[in-house]
Amino acid sequence: MKKIFFLLIYFYFALSQSIYNHPELEWRTFETEHFIFHFHDETENTAREAATVAEYIYKPITDLYDYEPPEKTTIIIKDTDDYANGAAYSFDNKIEIWALPLAMDLRGAHRWIQNVITHEFVHIIQIQASIKYSINVPGGFLQFIGYEDEKREDVLYGYPDQIISYPFPGIIIPPWLAEGTAQYMYDGANFDFLDSHRDMIIRDRILNDNLLTFSEMNSFGKRGIGNESIYNQGFSFVKWLTSIYGSDINRAISNEISKPFQFSISKALKNITGFDGNELYEQWSSYLKKDYSEKIGHLKDEVSGEIIEDTGDVNIYPTWSPNGKSYAFLSNRENDYFSQTNLYICQVNNKNAKKIAERVESKPSWINNNHLVYSRRSKINKNGSVFFDIYKYNLNLQEETRLTVNGRYTSPLVLKGKDQIIAFKTIDGSTNIYISDVNFIDFQRITEIDNGTVLFSATYDMNNNLLYIDGNDLHGRQLYTLDMETYDLNKISNPGWDTRNPNFHKNSLCYSVDKSGIFNIICEKDEKKSYAIIHSVKCINPHESAKKDNVRELERLPTFESRQSIWENYANKNGIPWRWDIIEYESVPLSVKSEVVVQSDTGAPNDPVPVE
């Protein structure tokens, strides 16, 4: 029995290691002047772009902090899960990047590899430049242990009854500083910026006197959009500091907190600027209050309606059933974090939302009044990966059916009148569109995208047999059309603005755009392009529309607190006119334009070779 027990333990740990290491993948390695890249065959395009970007940003970042790593930095590129993130391990001088681009509803869209490589390498350099002792010594402590008096002669020491420990951290970088500098990057960098979403969250907190305090910015562990607010406020605070003291203050802070006996970021700031952390925070927050008061002073009264879903911190992607008696939406009610969304169905006549599926993150689509399809993360597979799959739910039977296995499909859309379904799949950082019969699932690819363009959601114009899609290839989401006869994909929106969440209904194309600096819902009716513009006042920020006849379901961030709700506005019933003037949100820049960092003709500096 004991042998079986130990055999089971050995098998468990052996299985865990094999899952973690993904032995099914063929890994390769190449080196550039300052980096070592590891990638598997399925991520070659991402690795090549990452190599170009990394060498491009190496000198500006190391010059800013006057610091270079002691050896080449290792960058690992992987696409083993439907998960998007980057991680910097400063003491290991290593970066991990997932090839899947991050798609967060409360952040603007930026070219993923340019953004994440620069962001994580700033973490590497800033943290290493701020270490007090050595890259091999993350910290230490002094400890005293007291013992009871010995009771017997044959006992050398009594039982320990006292312990005193005093830690000496090797690094003291608070979250706002780490994330603020990583988003600031360096002078002239435009791979990330304070876009309309970040501006919206800070504006909401300022106008409702809910800005995180200096102390609250020093720690994560917050629910809702609290952690995201640390990113936003840190970014804004660092930008303000550099505007007052120059970008060299980033290096000065690292130099100051690297001193062996400097354990306070507030005192470090005082030694550099003459003001402690709280004093600088008050100056920055006063600047924001004045700035936002001036920006919104000319805005007219808001167009608003009755809130119909506000439980939880986020309620998004409302989608009407064909008969208009129910709607589906995603919500994080009963959960703590923004990304923990589940799928709910609500009948209009009773208003009681019922959860039907967990771990759903993209917009669902109705097949008919009793069936809908959606994408959600499936359970871990035999290789240790977690992928998105398409599922169908029968409302009559209250039964879920899995339609794909390890499919990696998101944002399914049923094409009205065609008995077909399309979905997106993102591999190696690029999204392609797949189509299948809705009754016999067998997805076939209909686009050939390999340039890092990412697609998010779609809507169907049955009359013209067109898909309207929002996607990203540089900065901000853009609108595309896909001809369902020729499969030609064309960008149709202004690249200077972020245009997203299209919805086509009865010859009207509605979408959200930040042309004024605040997102507004715009509707183009027929080809005459008459506009219904719902302008946003103060913190209100509509993102998406789901039209039902003359009813518009919108998502917004309400003025009274930082959470997203679904609200409805009866245009004809309340006598609200079909046309509003665009209200410019002054002093807010449009999306920053930049040239894509183009890889060399030969790709990576060295040809990839298998890992020995």
Q: Which residues does each predicted region cover?
A:
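A flexible loop/linker signature enriched in serine peptidases of the S9 family
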Residues: 311-313, 331-343, 356-361, 375-391, ...
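Beta/coil-rich, acidic/histidine-enriched accessory regions frequently appended to metallopeptidases
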Residues: 18-20, 26-29, 223-229, 253-371, ...
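Acidic/His/Gly-enriched intrinsically disordered linker/tail segments
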Residues: 21-23, 92-94, 112-116, 128-244, ...
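Short loop/turn segments that connect beta-strands within beta-propeller blades
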Residues: 347-351, 394-398, 437-441, 483-487, ...
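Blade-terminus and WD-like Trp-Asp/Gly-His loop motifs, strongest in beta-propeller folds
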Residues: 318-326, 364-371, 412-419, 458-465, ...
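Juxtacatalytic substrate-recognition/specificity segment
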Residues: 16-167
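Pro/Ala/Gly-rich low-complexity, hydrophilic intrinsically disordered segments
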Residues: 277-308, 312-317, 524-612
